[in-house]
């Protein structure tokens, strides 16, 4: 069997930069799936991508499928031949479909009878005959939201295709992909070197392209850009503002990266740096430079796609491009400052939050009220929280935010400071949107937390209250993110907030706007608590631990988290799973036998020392356990409950719960009910998996 490396490249016009990596990965994944389905052996597979190409490299691909021995069971002998011993039409048809006569068929004998059997060998197909259809199928499965046609062809793809290269080692695999016949021709850089060249061998792909000013390896190109930008920043005694999303996008825009440094007028630094950074990063794909004091410098790094003989001309061109954008930001900032945030409240009446839920003005009123309620729960300044909630959406009406939507919140903070608002009020206007994404920072003050939670709860209650519950991947109001935000802030900031109180207060604030109020409180709370599952699974918390706590439905997120920590620790104890098993047994017994009064334990009905021992042990720890529950010291609760291990084991080993005497039986059930009640103070540990 011959093994070679396969190179497949689809040469296109410039591909969408934000989608490039996903497209290339999907291309490789789809082709890998096709190879696996066809049972073609290979060692590994990787992808390459640049603005004008998607490529897949399969290492150690077999030249053909392995031959297979096949067996096909035919009709039973009893129906394959008639009374005279002649083959029936059913037998003849089956034999013909397998390319044999009935006489050539073998026999398969089992304890259930005898059947005709065909044994043969299926020759493996050549990779050259299989690949074109595989590649065509892999491309058709790409996640392309909107395809396009070009020329007079009806063929569609994300961008027009110019070349298709399929090399198995040094051999061209013939085929027609997306209307283009395969060849060994590769497009080089658009401006440097030869426009096209011929690739002699699949193994030469990266080196040949690099010789023609194309770094086809996305990861290598990204690393080079990172290194160049960091080196340029160091020369300026600064650090580049460089996140992975921007780095990926710039990597997808260039084939031969060259980092250069440019500047803008210092006067623009009077504008809040967030607006300038947004303009540079999001609009122009530049890397802003931050000095050692965390301040924005009037210098930036950009990455060009050519190695120019006159880099100053390119630098000058980029400086001319950024200047009017920064001038716009400066104009918006200076214009916006002439109008206070408070005076923009009226304009919020013209903007709908949601048709049934009213305007942003109404939403800000609700946020203000709920933020004040939360601040009161946190023993924080109610007036500051209410004020921040009231002004929370006013910056949406400023020129700056209308032009650069991503600076909402942070511009509200700057404008609030200019207006003379309290520092905590101004800070809350920025931090109200935190956390914006997974792993994002949280609000830093109680006032900010109050506004952030109020905003999220208002959205959750409102959207649920009009029946627009998220379904599948559809979540247009980002309710899942809002729920996770409420949980993260409450848990990580250790806030003593009860979702029941918050949700009910929010429901009341909507008046008659909500149309789906039946069980609304429970629906919203269950939805929020349901986000705990994914959150804790990401932290590698066992699912049964999460279920054990969720079964008790604690509605204080910080309290929920404390219980999770305690149950996880309890499960790791030697006695933990044993007591969990005993609790499961107790739960099963009590499910079949209702106990009306757990306080009716009568020691005079004890017939065994083990009953008395368990009763005494529970009495000894009951007061301490209840005190620990009040203090939310759930690990302390389990430490006390763990002391019951031996007593519980001895009880079940020596006592028959379902005694014939009804009074004795009910007394023992009451004893078990009390045991169960003690454990349920924290979680339903009967759910814990005994196999882990």
From Swiss-Prot:
Location in the cell: Cytoplasm
Signal peptide: none
Enzymatic reactions: tRNA(Gly) + glycine + ATP = glycyl-tRNA(Gly) + AMP + diphosphate
Predominant location: cytoplasm
GO molecular function: arginine-tRNA ligase activity; ATP binding; glycine-tRNA ligase activity
Enzyme Commission number(s) of this protein: 6.1.1.14
Database matches in InterPro entries: DALR_anticod-bd, Gly-tRNA-synth_bsu, Gly-tRNA-synth_heterodimer, tRNAsynth_Ia_anticodon-bd
Alphabetic keyword roster: Aminoacyl-tRNA synthetase, ATP-binding, Cytoplasm, Ligase, Nucleotide-binding, Protein biosynthesis
KW Protein biosynthesis (keyword) present: yes
Top-level taxon: Bacteria
GO CC annotations, alphabetized: cytosol
GO biological process: arginyl-tRNA aminoacylation; glycyl-tRNA aminoacylation
Entries under Pfam families matching the protein: DALR_1, tRNA_synt_2f
Record's subunit section: Tetramer of two alpha and two beta subunits.
PANTHER family found in the cross-reference section: GLYCINE--TRNA LIGASE, CHLOROPLASTIC_MITOCHONDRIAL 2, GLYCYL-TRNA SYNTHETASE
UniProt family annotation: Belongs to the class-II aminoacyl-tRNA synthetase family.
Protein name: Glycine--tRNA ligase beta subunit
Native species: Pseudoalteromonas atlantica (strain T6c / ATCC BAA-1087)
Gene from which this protein is expressed: glyS
